[in-house]
């Protein structure tokens, strides 16, 4: 018989490691599983030098958070361990974050943390401890498929859904992961925390970039990649210099404020040219992109990716964590994966993720995704038509 975590065996015979960040979500996850009789072990990862961030609201995995996680574990009567992952986190997350910004991208460090640390190293530790599952406080859910594997689903609470940050999870990892909060709202989670008597019931939510103690990510980049702070030109779509900047890391695609340019019409950042240290700006209508080239694609849908795509796979995609999934097509073009956005999207930035879904409503299935390498305004048919016109013109010149 399967227990509440869809595992064989009685709860009291089932060890579950809970990733405890010190926040209300992971604390309630541990409390729920403990109340159901599971053999719960709490693990907190110390991910960075927390001295400057100890008392900053919104920090995660810092000194105060470790203290809170330890207190919750003591309240629940479960063993709790703190593992030092600072070196690993710096190598795989912080340095990649700085590299990405220096190359003109807008990275999502939470995705790398989940992929490189939490769902790889911590999961391996959970297995070594004899656990049957690793549970987290993410607002997503999963369900067993007919073949015994598991599908990743969006949270019931669409305002709290965190599936965007978990697209890189592998099938093997999904089989071992459990997400007890997937059907809850944040309000319900806090109410449970109060019912369990947890001190973190009203604690502030953590922010995305947990390792930036001052809240200014450029401080991290200037220390690790000083060349990224070199000044350069701000140019318009025709390449005319209309201003200057103090480093491309201060900008992201879609940005309007802080350009320092006097203009009759609003200007937006359209792209970042790291090689030439140029920030390209233009009108809002130039922000809309219709095609996206992806890298590092992960597929957790049914079957093999290329077979699923065929001549083209109709699905929904999310290009920013705060946006709703939009209709799109996924294709293989010249050996690379491309997404065509049916209605187009503004502010599509390299370094962000493009996540695949089978629908746009709550608890839709996550099919995978990839990182945005490049975005283009032209639709595929427009590009093909232009290519054909150029070829015809060239042929005519040869005949002439």
Curated annotation (Swiss-Prot):
ATP binds at residues 19-26, 45, 137. It catalyses: S-sulfanyl-L-cysteinyl-[protein] + uridine(34) in tRNA + AH2 + ATP = 2-thiouridine(34) in tRNA + L-cysteinyl-[protein] + A + AMP + diphosphate + H(+). Catalyzes the 2-thiolation of uridine at the wobble position (U34) of tRNA, leading to the formation of s(2)U34. It comes from the Bacteria. The gene is mnmA. Its EC number is 2.8.1.13. InterPro entries: MnmA-like (IPR004506), MnmA-like_C (IPR046885), MnmA-like_central (IPR046884), MnmA-like_central_sf (IPR023382), Rossmann-like_a/b/a_fold (IPR014729). The record marks 138, 352 as: Interaction with tRNA. Belongs to the MnmA/TRMU family. CDD domains: MnmA_TRMU-like (cd01998). Keywords: ATP-binding, Cytoplasm, Disulfide bond, Nucleotide-binding, RNA-binding, Transferase, tRNA processing, tRNA-binding. Residues 160-162 are annotated as: Interaction with tRNA. It comes from Nitrobacter winogradskyi (strain ATCC 25391 / DSM 10237 / CIP 104748 / NCIMB 11846 / Nb-255). One of its GO terms (cellular component) is cytoplasm. One of its GO terms (molecular function) is tRNA-uridine 2-sulfurtransferase activity. Disulfide bonds join 113-210. GO terms for biological process: tRNA wobble position uridine thiolation. This is tRNA-specific 2-thiouridylase MnmA. Pfam families: tRNA_Me_trans, tRNA_Me_trans_C, tRNA_Me_trans_M. The active site is at 113 (nucleophile), 210 (cysteine persulfide intermediate). It is found in: Cytoplasm. PANTHER family: MITOCHONDRIAL TRNA-SPECIFIC 2-THIOURIDYLASE 1 (PTHR11933:SF5), TRNA 5-METHYLAMINOMETHYL-2-THIOURIDYLATE -METHYLTRANSFERASE (PTHR11933). Coiled coil: none annotated. Gene3D superfamilies: Adenine nucleotide alpha hydrolases-like domains (2.30.30.280), HUPs (3.40.50.620), Translation factors (2.40.30.10). The keyword Transferase applies.
């Amino acid at each position: 018989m399967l227990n509440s975590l869809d595992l064989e065996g009685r709860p009291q015979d089932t060890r579950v490691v809970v990733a405890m960040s010190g926040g209300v979500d992971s604390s309630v996850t541990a409390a729920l599983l403990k109340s159901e009789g599971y053999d719960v072990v709490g693990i907190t990862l110390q991910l960075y030098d927390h001295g400057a961030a100890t008392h900053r609201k919104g920090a995660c995995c810092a000194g105060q958070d470790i203290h809170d996680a330890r207190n919750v574990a003591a309240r629940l009567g479960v063993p709790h361990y703190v593992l030092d992952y600072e070196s690993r986190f710096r190598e795989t997350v912080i340095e990649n974050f700085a590299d990405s910004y220096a190359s003109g991208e807008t990275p999502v460090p939470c995705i790398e943390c989940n992929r490189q640390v939490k769902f790889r190293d911590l999961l391996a530790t959970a297995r070594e401890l004899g656990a049957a599952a690793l549970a987290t406080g993410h607002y997503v859910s999963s369900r067993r498929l007919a073949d015994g594997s598991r599908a990743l689903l969006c949270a019931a609470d669409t305002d709290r859904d965190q599936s965007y940050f978990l697209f890189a999870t592998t099938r093997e990892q999904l089989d071992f992961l459990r997400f007890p909060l997937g059907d809850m709202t944040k309000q319900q989670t806090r109410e449970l925390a109060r019912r369990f008597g947890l001190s973190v019931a009203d604690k502030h939510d953590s922010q995305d970039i947990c390792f930036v103690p001052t809240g200014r990510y450029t401080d991290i980049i200037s220390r690790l990649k000083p060349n990224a702070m070199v000044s350069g030109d701000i140019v318009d779509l025709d390449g005319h210099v209309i201003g200057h900047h103090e480093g491309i890391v201060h900008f992201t695609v879609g940005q309007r404020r802080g350009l320092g340019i006097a203009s009759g019409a609003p200007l937006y950042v359209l792209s970042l040219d790291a090689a030439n240290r140029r920030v390209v700006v233009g009108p809002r209508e130039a922000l809309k992109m219709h095609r996206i080239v992806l890298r590092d694609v992960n597929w957790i849908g049914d079957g093999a990716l290329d077979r699923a795509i065929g001549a083209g796979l109709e699905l929904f995609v999310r290009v920013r964590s705060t946006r709703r999934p939009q209709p799109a097509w996924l294709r293989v073009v010249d050996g690379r994966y491309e997404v065509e956005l049916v209605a187009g999207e503004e502010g599509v930035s390299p370094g962000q993720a493009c996540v695949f879904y089978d629908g746009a409503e709550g608890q839709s299935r996550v099919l995978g995704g990839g990182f945005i390498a490049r975005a283009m305004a032209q639709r595929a048919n427009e590009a093909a038509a232009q290519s054909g016109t150029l070829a015809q013109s060239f042929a005519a010149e040869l005949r002439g």
